[in-house]
Amino acid sequence: MMRRSLFQRNDLHYKNKEVMITYNAEGIAMPKIKKRLTSKWIKAVAASHGRKVGEVGYLFVNDDKILEVNREYLGHDYYTDIITFDYDEDDVINGDLVISLDTVRTNAEQFGKSYDDELHRVIIHGILHLCGINDKGPGEREIMEANEDRALELLATLRSE
């Protein structure tokens, strides 16, 4: 049984028979990402973890909106770069990912990364969560970061093709 998305989706998506990845923005300008390339990358990363992509929705927001979502749905009173809502079914990943572009920009500056690199790191971070990789327990953060690094290397390869 398919679930209904937490967020209303527009027509910005990459779709084929098995995959639907949507990209929307609320209260902030849509980031300049190559949607087809990003969707191909997401599908490849999921496949490398033995998963298929079903319905994945990205919602890009500002800090005020992510704080609202964090409070309303998770009971947390703090800003974050991404919140992942997991609706996985067996080996198919399904979920909504809410990304604060304000926090992405702040983190890029803090960590000395480009905005584009940090945005793609956060985009794939949510997919890795949907693939079952956690980052809260002992040693898990290092595993997550290693997976992010491998995924970003794959993105660089796909961009050069």
Regions inferred by a protein language model and the residue ranges of each:
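Conserved ATP-binding N-box helix of the HATPase_c
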Residues: 128
